[in-house]
Amino acid sequence: MKDTIRQLIQQALDQLTADGTLPAGLTPDIQVENTKDRSHGDFASNIAMMLAKPAGMKPRDLAARLVEAIPAHEQLAKVEIAGPGFLNFFQDHVWLAASLDRALADERLGVRKAGPAQRVVIDLSSPNLAKEMHVGHLRSTIIGDAVARVLEFLGDTVIRQNHVGDWGTQFGMLLAYLEEQPVDAEAELHDLEVFYRAAKKRFDESPEFADRARELVVKLQAGDPDCLRLWTRFNEISLSHCQKVYDRLGVKLSMADVMGESAYNDDLAQVVADLTAKGLLTEDNGALCVFLEEFRNAEGNPLPVIVQKAGGGYLYATTDLAAMRYRHNVLHADRVLYFVDQRQALHFQQVFEVARRAGFVPAGMELEHMGFGTMNGADGRPFKTRDGGTVKLIDLLEEAESRAYALVKERNEQRAERGEEPFDEVQLREIGRVVGIDSVKYADLSKHRTSDYSFNFELMLSFEGNTAPYLLYACTRVASVFRKLGQGREQLGGKIVLEQPQELALAAQLAQFGDLINNVALKGVPHLLCAYLYELAGLFSSFYEHCPILTAEDPAQKDSRLRLAALTGRTLEQGLELLGLKTLERM
């Protein structure tokens, strides 16, 4: 609908330009937003206020000319002027109802695929191997997964790339520890965190051990067979731990998506050679760097992008440049999205610029850093265990499931007291699993990607507010309507007729699903989808309360309201699926 309104406004602008009301050459970015109060229309635009000055007119006068010039359209009932010159657009209720009937008959809920389709590489999760995933890996993993799902739904070809840290000093440290204590260490491999901490303790306390670790890194990089065999074993164990977490989270990541730092080792020397050939490298204290004039420190000096250390070693920037070239040359990406901590913003700005100057990626290939804030504890400080250690992600998920199980078990006892059929233990465990994992994911996804947030089990497991349990309950509420009816959603007759205010409000929200999904894909911000679903659930609750469904006044009204309920249920389920969340028929 927003695209239609933009097109109508553009047609009006073209007409006013042709008759001399507007000067030629204006190319405004036409903004169309949802109104906060639907009594003032469904959508609003500030285009008249934007163009009043170049037109030499008062905003309301220009708005009046625009209203006259906007062509009539079946989707619009009327256009009004509000305040200092806003244009308020009212949807035609008959057209709106018919569009929802079409959406209900469509497996895609009326959401058109975006065109032309792109090949999009999603760089997500990317934990360092040789130790277990911790809570800091949650955001990249689930935000990246949600955006990938949305892009796939809109027709893009999505290539997930798990750029794991499988190379570097930590492996020399682990190899040295395994060399010292082969029997005990092999046993400890099943708990990577214990093994890693023990090796790190030796590395920090013993200069001799640290020297040996560095020697083994050199041997590993030189292709020593024994070192490579053990390194491979470390990675296999570490990746198996990661996969268990991915499976528990329900994200679409598998071993086939792993493309770690080591995959680019053979290209790093060539990256440096190509940068040299382009005349981009400068030697600085033995290191090879690219200096970009637009990136300067506090003293005003250009900041270096170091691609090779004085000792010959390579850095993250070198690997990232090799990965960008691979993603262009081999994966043929049109767009690459990096879901990496916001604190790496400068790094990505620099390497993106170096990649373009070096010709590693073409001008038309989009490189976007989808930075995110940090997850903190309830006290607002970095999330730690009680003894100050790192919280394993798997432990967090297990606690979430345990807490959710206790919650649903308590509610199950209340069901029995009310005379309702209680769930058995198997059902309770499954409900607890879904509620627990969904709650952790939704609490994160519902926050703006770039914001920090405080992790709080009590808030995220609440059945009130913008939470997963609230939305899951909304889904079960819709399902209960059709259980009582004894009929499936796909067997409905009649058509939608919008009469009551609650019906109109619900219908207007349902009609915006496609626009919303496209916005999430464009900006990489799943919280917009969360906010949409939360508002949709609230509007359905109001509709359910004020508009009797199964006891409607006549069959036509009953059919209409059943169809609205069915479309609401399907939209909630589709939206939650795009976020990577499971749904329940009963809870």
UniProtKB/Swiss-Prot annotation:
It catalyses: tRNA(Arg) + L-arginine + ATP = L-arginyl-tRNA(Arg) + AMP + diphosphate. Transmembrane segments: none annotated. One of its GO terms (cellular component) is cytoplasm. It is an enzyme of class 6 (ligase). A motif ('HIGH' region) lies at residues 127-137. One of its GO terms (molecular function) is ATP binding. Its main location: cytoplasm. It comes from the Bacteria. The keyword Repeat does not apply. Belongs to the class-I aminoacyl-tRNA synthetase family. Monomer. This is Arginine--tRNA ligase.
